[in-house]
Amino acid sequence: MKIIAYGARVDEIQYFKQWAKDTGNTLEYHTEFLDENTVEWAKGFDGINSLQTTPYAAGVFEKMHAYGIKFLTIRNVGTDNIDMTAMKQYGIRLSNVPAYSPAAIAEFALTDTLYLLRNMGKVQAQLQAGDYEKAGTFIGKELGQQTVGVMGTGHIGQVAIKLFKGFGAKVIAYDPYPMKGDHPDFDYVSLEDLFKQSDVIDLHVPGIEQNTHIINEAAFNLMKPGAIVINTARPNLIDTQAMLSNLKSGKLAGVGIDTYEYETEDLLNLAKHGSFKDPLWDELLGMPNVVLSPHIAYYTETAVHNMVYFSLQHLVDFLTKGETSTEVTGPAK
């Protein structure tokens, strides 16, 4: 069978080549993203594999339908950048990789948390300014003395809970669809109580429409003074302007943001112009109690291997069996 892959990163290429060798399938890969123009390269292929944070527009699915291509598999989890209505209209079926490496993202959230609890941004800022003495004045907090509120107890949230619990933290959690059975490492609470009780709030919820700005001014008002918020989940979860206001007022002690609210716009400008101007990003970047990263929490060798191999196997399942266990019919985490 013939498969075409889009958004290929340098680190993925070795796995694309190895997969093609292992399976004997024809695999053509491109670094460009899948859009209304590049989709034309897929004519004559059996299925499409892709990875991107930029939108999958309706025109992509229209042309897939015209070419007789019925299946798209993505190498990530989230589908909030996919026009699901158009996808269904043109009869395209979709699969994602719901759990390529939960540990990668959970460990990253823990890393940001420890960095902020020990005021390392402030320490580094003073060292870079040449003030060694002042750099030693920022007293930290121990994770084992904190209450950590984990929002979302799916694959990633469960690993995060174990990590935080391993440091001795008290862990509480919120999920509209709670796990059944015993869960000795944490207690479920309401979302309001999670905001009120947590010293650290760690987000692992999907980017579906009803979760847009789930962390907003009202949520910040409920939080403890000196709370820390970590988002390695999806870009739309936090009202960034409200977050900035609470950082400036001192209500928030710090934030760790790997999935920035306006990352899609910035990436589109970066691709088009070679750079982007985002005053809000620049302001956050200059704050020592803010840890920003470019959507890399998932980015480990294990995760990249699994993203490639799992997603391509899902495409093979679609093409040979007409189904796959990870088919997505609605918004996915």
Curated annotation (Swiss-Prot):
Keyword Calcium: no
Statement: the UniProt record of this protein carries the keyword Lipoprotein: no
Reactions this protein catalyses: a (2R)-2-hydroxycarboxylate + NAD(+) = a 2-oxocarboxylate + NADH + H(+); (2R)-hydroxy-4-methylpentanoate + NAD(+) = 4-methyl-2-oxopentanoate + NADH + H(+); (R)-3-phenyllactate + NAD(+) = 3-phenylpyruvate + NADH + H(+)
EC category name: oxidoreductase
pH-activity relationship: Optimum pH is 5.5-7.0 for the reduction of 4-methyl-2-oxopentanoate. Optimum pH is 8.0-9.0 for the oxidation of (R)-2-hydroxy-4-methylpentanoate.
UniProt-annotated binding residues for NAD(+): H155, I156, D175, V205, N211, T232, R234, D258
Residues holding 4-methyl-2-oxopentanoate: Y100, H295
Disulfide linkage: none
Keywords: NAD, Oxidoreductase
EC number: 1.1.1.345
GO molecular function, one term: phenyllactate dehydrogenase (NAD+) activity
Described purpose of this protein according to its UniProt entry: Catalyzes the NADH-dependent reversible reduction of various 2-ketocarboxylic acids to the corresponding D-2-hydroxycarboxylic acids. In vitro can use various substrates, including 4-methyl-2-oxopentanoate (2-oxoisocaproate), 2-oxopentanoate, 2-oxohexanoate and phenylpyruvate.
Subunit structure: Homodimer.
Protein name (database record): D-2-hydroxyacid dehydrogenase (NAD+)
